[in-house]
């Protein structure tokens, strides 16, 4: 297979996936970026700082990492479900609300990971995360 053919297939696949998710807009880009940041900071917390609350020893465990990837994958499947529901009713509200909710969850997790590393968190960001947590608790 030539590099041109490979690029064509990758482009077609990427376009199809983006279409399934309602487009590669800023919200979806932000969610994917935040998911990557959360996963990386989780690896740093466990691998470097050994302070992960996800494992008994606080260190890296492949099972904990795999669970994290599975959760993120299922989160994207939930976004896909929300997008398809929007397609049925002719709106974009459900997808947008779902993506924003997952962005909030990823933000909270990133801030928690930074705190476990001893990174000073600006007060404004801490307050914003507290508000997000309270709103998440109300919807549960």
Where are these regions (language model features)?
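Alpha-helical transmembrane segments of multipass membrane proteins
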Residues: 15-20, 80, 84
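Juxtamembrane helix-capping/reentrant segments at transmembrane boundaries
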Residues: 52-75
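Core segments of transmembrane alpha-helices
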Residues: 7-12, 71-82
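Transmembrane helix interruption/hinge and helix-loop junction motifs
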Residues: 21-27, 89-91
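Hydrophobic alpha-helical transmembrane segments and immediately flanking/interface helices
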Residues: 88-117
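Juxtamembrane helix-loop transition segments at the membrane interface in multi-pass membrane proteins
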Residues: 45-57, 120-122
